């Protein structure tokens, strides 16, 4: 027997979906929250649960929020199937509010047989410290099952369009800047949840052998400091990592380099123009010519921000890439090669090392010395 569904709809109209799931990070007048859900069961016996939609208002009483409506319904279902394990997936226009987030964490802590994956179109009050802490509490895994939260990318929007929209068999047409907004929100969520890189990803991509092969991605780790009483103070909430977006991934037809993704997110930090900041980047490859030009423009226009770049390897250090690095240095950026100290710092700060110390690879120091000499020659405009 199924419990009765209340306050649900089967599908939404196309304009309703496009309006409410539009993923620009800062939006007004989107006060209705749409929650599309799917419930799957583990094991050979799978009760036929239908995917449906809850909706509610942002500023209404908590019990009318779609997240709470879902759990009210789901709790009734659980009473009929206490021994079953469930995988619940949400696709939601706004991430849950602080109170909903805390109640969700309590529910999941009390029912370890339920796992919840949340795909969000936008982040609600992502700048609020209390909200950030609530999200971390919901998504942390150390003390037992919790939720997994991700930003909706093209694939999730396409899935919702096919599953929850009266699409009349028309294909999903992404709006302008969908992939760019996805990257911005992905980076901001990573900052909030303090995502860490897995050790193999770090050691593979940051290996500093000068002529290494098969490293086609650029990883960029970053941290931000603010000057206070003549001392640089680390801003823990402004720390994270990202990588370039390959062509045809997450809706990027032409791809987007890590440095440009990083520049996209800085305006959302809302750095105080009357304060001095130092941004430090640790990159697996040095910037290409175009990215170096854009980074130079940024620091030229933002005099309150200084930029330090430590790179593991030099990308195509012939021709225009050399010119780009010189332009970036002339604009005021400090460019250096990563040494053991920087590799260890990245390992300790950005990697989920599980308490294991950083183990340098063979040739690390020799490669750093060689690359440092080549970088000096490039910046001094000397022939190799």
Curated annotation (Swiss-Prot):
Changing residue 244 to A: Abolishes enzyme activity. Changing residue 248 to A: Improved catalytic efficiency of cytidine deaminase activity. It is found in: Cytoplasm; Nucleus; Cytoplasm, P-body. Changing residue 74 to W: Remains sensitive to HIV-1 Vif and able to bind Vif. GO terms for biological process: base conversion or substitution editing; cytidine deamination; cytidine to uridine editing; defense response to virus; DNA cytosine deamination; innate immune response; negative regulation of single stranded viral RNA replication via double stranded DNA intermediate; negative regulation of viral genome replication. Changing residue 67 to Q: Decreases cytidine deaminase activity. The record marks 244 as: Interaction with DNA. It catalyses: a 2'-deoxycytidine in single-stranded DNA + H2O + H(+) = a 2'-deoxyuridine in single-stranded DNA + NH4(+). Changing residue 334 to R: In 4KR mutant; decreased ubiquitination and degradation by an ECS complex hijacked by HIV-1 Vif. Changing residue 247 to K: Modifies the spectrum of action against mobile genetic elements. Changing residue 285 to A: Abolishes enzyme activity. Residues 29-138, 214-328 form the CMP/dCMP-type deaminase domain. Expressed in spleen, testes, ovary and peripheral blood leukocytes and CD4+ lymphocytes. Also expressed in non-permissive peripheral blood mononuclear cells, and several tumor cell lines; no expression detected in permissive lymphoid and non-lymphoid cell lines. Exists only in the LMM form in peripheral blood-derived resting CD4 T-cells and monocytes, both of which are refractory to HIV-1 infection. LMM is converted to a HMM complex when resting CD4 T-cells are activated or when monocytes are induced to differentiate into macrophages. The CMP/dCMP deaminase domain 1 mediates RNA binding, RNA-dependent oligomerization and virion incorporation whereas the CMP/dCMP deaminase domain 2 confers deoxycytidine deaminase activity and substrate sequence specificity. This is DNA dC->dU-editing enzyme APOBEC-3G. It comes from Homo sapiens.
